[in-house]
């Protein structure tokens, strides 16, 4: 057995073995395990021309990240002359490449060749929540705000980086048992140069490679307070919603080939490199988190300012309707209702602006949500 090694033979190679001959890759594993948890509490004092009191705030956050990778280092056997296979069992290539001029001899078992995909998986999640309240020295709450957020990242990758195979100029080896090539190859210089005899046949299967990752994050703020002029409690409302997402999905194929016999049979030793569509793992958890968090900040800031502009525009329309001498009182009431908070026109504007801010269905729904529950946007 040869594992993760490179062998170079200048002359001929004789495999005179009663059992199996196995060439395989060396496999390495990598693990990432992380978790975090934090909390905080603070008290301060505030004062302005109308109110004074204590500011109390508290926050908590927790999360985790789990990743696992598998990497393979193929064995390589390079023979300058003829490779004589006198094997009583199977010739097994499990993550290996055999190159030479000519292959001959008898294999009483099968040729079993397969490529090993490298793999990588990751899953992570973060949550946070915070509350802040202003309480007057008289014990009466002046305002309260709550923020909560969540972000998630998931990734999955499996792809062959170096294909398993046998690359010769010619071959007349005889194989007794049914053979199999999984994302692997047996090539010669031309189809006519491959005189290999598979007494019980040969089957080929291709390997489907994939790379998928997805991350998303959302942050929601709610607030309520006492109007400084009316001293009445304002109903709770959404003070800001931010949403972000990032992701990618790609696939490729690692093809099998036995020159002139099976699979992509037109492939020869000269162009064997065309069989493996290399797929790079472009996932970077730090970049994905940075991207989604940036989108959250932008959409949340946009969402805080845009509703105010909608409210101002709607109020101008209401004022124009009230001043329109061509409308009856009933018509004015009907039109004003459409432009009031929760009215069909204003909700439509919020929804459209939400889509502009995030470019997604989610952000459009966020915009609609602000419209339906935003009595504070006029303050």
Model-inferred region functions:
Residues 358-363:
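Transmembrane helix interruption/hinge and helix-loop junction motifs
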Residues 365, 369-378:
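Small-residue-rich, membrane-active alpha-helical segments
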Residues 1-357, 377:
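Binding/recognition "hotspot" determinant
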């Amino acid at each position: 057995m040869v594992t993760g090694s490179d062998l170079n033979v200048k002359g001929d190679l004789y495999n005179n073995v009663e059992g199996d001959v196995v060439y395989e890759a060396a496999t390495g594993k990598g693990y990432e395990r992380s978790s975090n948890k934090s909390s905080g509490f603070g008290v301060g004092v505030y004062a302005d021309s109308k109110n004074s009191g204590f500011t109390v705030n508290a926050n908590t956050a927790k999360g985790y990240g789990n990743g696992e990778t598998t990497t393979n280092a193929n064995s390589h056997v390079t023979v300058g002359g003829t490779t004589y296979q006198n094997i009583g069992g199977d010739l097994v290539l499990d993550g290996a490449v055999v190159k030479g001029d000519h292959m001959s001899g008898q294999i009483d078992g099968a040729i079993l060749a397969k490529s090993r995909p490298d793999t990588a998986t990751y899953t992570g999640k973060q949550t946070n929540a915070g509350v802040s309240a202003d309480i007057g020295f008289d014990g009466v709450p002046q305002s309260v705000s709550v923020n909560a957020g969540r972000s998630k990242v998931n990734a999955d990758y499996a792809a062959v980086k170096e294909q398993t195979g046998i690359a010769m100029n010619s071959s007349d080896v005889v194989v007794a048992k049914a053979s199999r090539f999984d994302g692997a190859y047996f090539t010669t210089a031309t189809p006519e140069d491959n005189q290999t005899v598979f007494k019980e046949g040969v089957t080929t299967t291709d390997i489907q490679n994939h790379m998928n990752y997805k991350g998303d994050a959302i942050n929601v703020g709610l607030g309520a307070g006492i109007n400084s002029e009316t001293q009445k409690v304002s109903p709770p409302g959404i003070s800001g919603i931010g949403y972000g997402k990032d992701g990618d999905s790609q696939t490729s194929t690692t093809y099998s080939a036995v020159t002139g016999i099976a699979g992509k049979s037109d492939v020869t030793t000269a162009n064997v490199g065309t069989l493996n569509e290399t797929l790079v793992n472009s996932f970077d958890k730090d970049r994905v988190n940075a991207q989604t968090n940036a989108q959250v900040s932008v959409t949340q800031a946009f969402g805080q300012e845009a509703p105010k502009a909608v409210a101002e525009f709607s109020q101008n329309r209401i004022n124009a309707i009230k001043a329109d001498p061509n409308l009856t009182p009933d018509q004015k009431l009907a039109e004003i209702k459409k432009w009031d908070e929760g009215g069909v026109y204003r909700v439509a504007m919020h929804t459209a602006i939400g889509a502009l801010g995030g470019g997604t269905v989610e952000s459009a729904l966020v915009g609609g949500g602000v419209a339906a529950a935003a009595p504070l946007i006029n303050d």
